[in-house]
Regions:
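Zinc-dependent deaminase
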Residues: 1-16, 29, 45-117
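Pre-active-site segment of Zn-dependent metallo-hydrolases
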Residues: 19-26
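Immediate flanking context of iron-sulfur cluster ligation sites
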Residues: 28-41
Length: 117
């Protein structure tokens, strides 16, 4: 498994775990009344999970021109083909979010190359 595949697998597991934990805490399968705040625009799988969980809305910082599925590449959460739709608002503290992501990936690359973060 490549480092990218490993990171994607971890991200998907964490997103699913967060939704399951929220559902457990609320005692409900649907997360109506809940708002999600994330650093990076959700990918297709995460955007689909938001729709399936019936979240009320999502705010994200940095846009993802390659995989962003809230507005950059595709607006999955607003697609009328789905029973539940939710608004997504991007660009929330965008510069800060982008800087945070850059630092995260720089540290990750440093660790993968044998350095210290």
């Amino acid at each position: 498994m490549t480092p990218h595949e490993s990171l994607m697998r971890l991200a998907l597991e964490e997103a699913g775990a967060a939704i399951r934990e929220a559902a457990r805490v609320l005692g409900a399968r649907r997360l109506t009344g809940c708002t999600l705040y994330v650093t990076l625009e959700p990918c297709p799988m995460c955007a689909g999970a938001m729709v399936m969980a019936c979240l009320d809305r999502c705010y994200f910082g940095a846009r993802d021109a390659r995989q962003g599925c809230c507005e950059s590449v595709y607006a999955l959460p607003g697609d009328p083909a789905f029973y539940h739709r939710l608004p997504c608002v991007g660009g929330l503290m965008e510069e800060e979010a982008a800087a945070l992501l850059r630092r995260f990936f720089q540290a990750r690359r440093s660790t993968e190359e044998g350095g210290t973060p």
